[in-house]
Swiss-Prot record:
It holds the Pfam family Porin_1. GO terms for cellular component: cell outer membrane; pore complex. Homotrimer. Forms mixed heterotrimers with OmpF; other mixed heterotrimers are also probable. The N- and C-termini are two parts of the same strand. Extracellular loop 3 folds back into the lumen of the barrel forming a constriction zone that controls the pore size, while the trimer interface is formed by the packing of hydrophobic residues on the outer edges of beta strands 1 to 5 and further stabilized by extracellular loop 2 which reaches into the neighboring monomer. Residues 1-21 form the signal peptide. It comes from Escherichia coli O6:H1 (strain CFT073 / ATCC 700928 / UPEC). Residues 45-50, 83-91, 114-146, 173-201, 227-241, 268-279, 310-320, 349-364 are extracellular. Keywords: Cell outer membrane, Ion transport, Membrane, Porin, Signal, Transmembrane, Transmembrane beta strand, Transport. InterPro entries: Gram-neg_bact_OMP, Porin_dom_sf, Porin_gammaproteobac, Porin_Gram-ve, Porin_Gram-ve_CS. This is Outer membrane porin C. Its main location: membrane. The gene is ompC. GO terms for biological process: monoatomic ion transmembrane transport.
């Protein structure tokens, strides 16, 4: 009986937000759940910048309040704290923090730090034991977590079509710290939460649509964001008025089998190490997993991001280059719903060459070994 329960629980545990959250309060239409995990994690690699302790923890809550029979308020917050640094360093940050209202079948609207709608599709392949989901990144326009997202979501198409979901999203500008890079000193591009150019974004809009039926899923998402002054005028590659993303994905999740693939094409939106962005990039991720009843979940995946027409890097002109390319082989063993251990081997297929060195892109293999407690 225990092994059968594990086979049912594990897919739920893979969903962001920890499906097995601890209920703290549930009374009079008010509900509060607490969730989190501690990952005792170690990397083994010839790349000394990542080799060693990578321990971290995450803690979050989800809350709901019943305003009326048809209106529900909700909020979520999630925080990450690194456990591999001395106490004198501040290595912690907010992953998500948003609040919203849900109007029964009409849909929901929320605002705050959240996931971009592109991730509605690309998240299907972001399920590896440790690695994966790195053909994009956080604070990368509307591709993953970011600030200032206003999101409308509709589930089951107004209650009329089971499994048909769509979302529309707007992201406000997150610009520079002080505008000191603007020679006109006009102040455009300055925001109260300024950051370096690689993490900035202008106003953006996006949308996604997904359909799930008996274990099969298909989805598509698009986004288009203005780029900031800093992003186009501080010597970074991949300049342009807008950053655009177009993605499509497929998945199968049934009978203990999980298969997923996504293809994304971006313009001025995929980061090239520390150098800037690819004028055009083609990103591909595919993963296959199987859940054994006794708790073992092996995983194999392939990920590639190829930059096109990159331009001049360190005095040399580059056309097409692989930004990321690796095979991932791993496995997770679930002792129960709260305790698991995993190993994940990232087999790096990139060559150590002038381009990867100039961009600061790692070309070494990494083996990750982790022991996880989650609630």
């Amino acid at each position: 009986m225990k092994v059968k329960v594990l086979s049912l629980l594990v897919p739920a545990l893979l969903v962001a937000g920890a499906a097995n959250a601890a209920e703290v309060y549930n009374k009079d239409g008010n509900k509060l759940d607490l969730y989190g995990k501690v990952d005792g994690l170690h990397y083994f690699s010839d790349d000394k910048s990542v080799d060693g302790d990578q321990t971290y923890m995450r803690l979050g809550f989800k809350g709901e309040t019943q305003v009326t029979d048809q209106l529900t308020g909700y909020g979520q917050w999630e925080y990450q704290i690194q456990g591999n640094a001395p106490e004198s360093e501040n290595n912690s940050w907010t992953r998500v923090a948003f609040a919203g209202l849900k109007f029964q079948d009409i849909g929901s609207f929320d605002y705050g730090r959240n996931y971009g709608v592109v991730y509605d599709v690309t998240s299907w392949t972001d399920v590896l034991p440790e690695f994966g989901g790195d053909t994009y990144g956080s604070d990368n326009f509307m591709q993953q977590r970011g600030n200032g997202f206003a999101t409308y979501r509709n589930t089951d198409f107004f209650g009329l079509v089971d499994g048909l979901n769509f979302a529309v999203q707007y992201q406000g500008q997150n610009g520079s710290v002080s505008g000191e890079n603007d020679p006109d000193f006009t102040g455009h591009g300055i925001t109260n939460n300024g950051r370096k150019a690689l993490r900035q974004n202008g106003d953006g809009v996006g949308g996604s649509i997904t359909y799930d039926y008996e274990g099969f899923g298909v989805g598509a998402a698009v986004s288009s964001s203005k780029r900031t002054w800093d992003q186009n005028n501080t010597g970074l590659i991949g300049t342009g008025d807008r950053a655009e993303t177009y993605t499509g994905g497929l998945k199968y999740d049934a009978n203990n089998i999980y298969l997923a693939a996504q293809y994304t094409q971006t313009y001025n939106a995929t980061r090239v190490g520390s150098l800037g962005w690819a004028n055009k990039a083609q990103n591909f991720e595919a993963v296959a997993q199987y859940q054994f009843d006794f708790g073992l979940r092996p995983s194999v995946a392939y990920l590639q991001s190829k930059g096109k027409n990159l331009g001049v890097v360190a005095g040399r002109n580059y056309d097409d280059e692989d930004i990321l390319k690796y095979v991932d082989v791993g496995a997770t063993y679930y002792f129960n719903k709260n305790m698991s251990t995993y190993v994940d081997y990232k087999i790096n297929l990139l060559d150590d060459n002038q381009f990867t060195r100039a961009a600061g892109i790692n070309t070494d293999d990494i083996v990750a070994l982790g022991l996880v407690y989650q609630f």
